[in-house]
């Protein structure tokens, strides 16, 4: 078994020369193009796409990496998360695999919260080895806040006691306030849940497309960096981009999704020494 990471580790996630500031206790290092991820005794270089200056908010509930004993990560979402998967630009795996995470992205366009339950019914029951999860569902919202909260709560309960990172949505319409409020409530109910406030990050100019919902090309890299910061280094260094089972983006509106790659990236292992 690969030994747990220790000491000082330097990992370059993304190329670029943006400026990153990390919120929290106010004493994090801030350099041009470099951010400090707390959580282990190591240094990690995080770079944003050129032209971005973003302060990442504190991760409520704490970083995921220090809470887990394994590195298998299940990510569940809609078109926004899907756009960062290996069938498109692969931004998410490019960011997380060097940190030691074995990442499965189960995300499809136009999916509502109940999609998360369906994913877990298939992947959680068949594979008990997941160590943590990221859930980003709520952009597609039917307008019933109680029903939405029930679905998110059910997802969290199915995943318990695994650490879960819930992600708020961008505020592209007034009803998203109900979505994000429900996410905050559910996050506050469970000790195993942490919160990434994408609502704040997505306000930065250039992160979203003109529709105010989906990610711009550089925004996909920003999103991957934000998730990487919330996760932190995994306990093991054998990162990999795992095969996805849910890949149907046919419900997406025209020009919503990026251009797909001709050949989906094969599952890869990290070359982190």
Describe the function of each predicted region.
Residues 176-273:
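Catalytic His-Asp segment of secreted/periplasmic serine-dependent ester chemistry enzymes
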Residues 1-76, 81-82, 126-129, 228, ...:
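N-terminal secretory targeting modules
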Residues 66-151, 171-181:
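Conserved SGNH/GDSL esterase-like catalytic core that processes O-acyl groups on lipids
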Residues 74, 165-167, 194-196:
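Hydrophobic/aromatic beta-strand patches that form the interior of the parallel beta-sheet core
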Residues 18-26, 117-124, 128, 140-158, ...:
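Extracellular glycan-modifying ectodomains
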Residues 160-164:
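A short helix->loop->beta-strand "cap" motif at the edges of active sites that frequently abuts
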């Amino acid at each position: 078994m690969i030994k747990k990471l220790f000491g000082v580790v330097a990992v370059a996630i993304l190329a670029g020369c943006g400026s990153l500031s990390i919120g929290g206790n106010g004493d994090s290092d801030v350099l041009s193009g470099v951010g400090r991820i707390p959580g282990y005794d190591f240094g990690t270089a995080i770079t944003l796409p050129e032209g971005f200056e973003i302060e990442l908010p504190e991760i409520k509930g704490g970083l995921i990496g220090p809470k887990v004993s394994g590195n298998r990560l299940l990510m569940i979402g809609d078109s926004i998360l899907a756009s960062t998967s290996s069938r498109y630009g692969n931004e998410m795996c490019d960011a997380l695999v060097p940190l030691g995470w074995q990442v499965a992205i189960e995300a499809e366009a136009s999916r509502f919260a109940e999609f998360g339950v369906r994913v877990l019914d298939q992947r959680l029951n068949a594979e008990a080895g997941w160590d943590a999860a990221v859930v980003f569902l709520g952009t597609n919202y039917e307008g019933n806040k109680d029903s939405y909260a029930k679905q998110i709560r059910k997802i969290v309960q199915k995943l318990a006691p695994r650490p879960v990172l819930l992600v708020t949505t961008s505020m592209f319409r007034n009803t998203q306030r109900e979505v994000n409020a429900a996410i905050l409530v559910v996050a506050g109910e469970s000790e195993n849940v942490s919160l990434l406030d994408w609502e704040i990050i997505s306000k930065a100019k250039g992160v979203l497309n003109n529709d105010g919902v989906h990610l711009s090309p550089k925004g996909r890299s920003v999103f991957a960096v934000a998730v990487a910061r919330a996760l932190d280094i995994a306990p093991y260094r054998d990162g990999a981009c795992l095969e996805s089972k849910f890949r149907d983006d046919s419900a997406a509106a025209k020009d919503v999704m990026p251009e797909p790659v001709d050949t989906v990236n094969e599952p890869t292992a990290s070359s982190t020494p």
